[in-house]
């Protein structure tokens, strides 16, 4: 097992050998989609992308060439079949996550994106490429060249990239902006999020989507079931269910104006102001001691010490 990028979550590392083959078994996924549709939800299945999947694996004995050259030709027919099955089940959009784009994977892996997504582009679904955990602004030209209909960017970890994509991303394609932190337990500053997105909304209109920065699997499920938390601390928190509510507030503000969510914004502002100064987490004596430390006292001699 190893960590999923820089998170505290782990995954079982796949091992690739020369005789590795791939077959699609979408029974469980399709059952979940049918269940969601039966409850009236619009669906957007999310998959780990083929380039990221191949890159994350470990090469075993018997592979004498580059992993991507061996694996991707085998992976792509399976991905294409899965996308066609999702389309047949009524999926209009499918999110394909490629966090490799935010890692230092090297040019050989980046060169794989164009042929991979060219092959996946005719499968009957609209594709949203998902990125997270770091900026992908340096790959703007590559991402624009892909035959996909949308892109998700993490603007919590890399807020500076929003300006790059707001200006450079094609206006006829979806830009999904992750401004609600999917990796923590704290309420968002909704007034700040709305102010950040208003000029982007003016440029992109309906092609602006708002989203968590990454999957909400990194957050606990629902704050409402927590009965033993300190009341003050609980008032600063938002778990996955509450973060979805926050997204709804931002959406309404962008579509109907801030007056439509005045009460929600007032509550958000009050929580942010309280957390910024509350004595439960702000100790002036500790701050003074830290400020008095000699220069360099908070740094290790070796980054791995």
Report the location of each language-model feature.
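Domain-level signal for soluble alpha/beta catalytic cores
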Residues: 1-305
